[in-house]
């Protein structure tokens, strides 16, 4: 082998705020790999056009242990800026429930086309099937129901329609208005 630069410290790229250094850089040329583990088990790679994190053994954990802080997943917003697409919200977790938050006007899309959308626009929430396929809501629990609930007009919530899996019937709990 010959001599090759694997990485270098670039003092000229350091950032300053006028009185102190705010960022220092270790530079790795394109197509370098940062490899951790005797068998190169965890690798970080940048080719010049894409970046990869590769784990080849065991589970890969991404952990933020700062109290009440989040993990934010951001990407280009379509116009050169960055946007949070979803976050793991540690400030909402209460020990029993964990939260994955999708900001208003986010769309969770499923299928290659995509075909199924779940979204909230800040006011209303929607589940939409966009192709000529069926939308199937299925409960596979033995003797369990599918229950549709909404506001009861007095600040509470009540069931309006139950697909009763125990008694194999449809129950309508409130007045039914059939319109032409």
What are these regions (language model features)?
Residues 1-180:
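Intrinsic low-complexity, repeat-rich intrinsically disordered segments enriched
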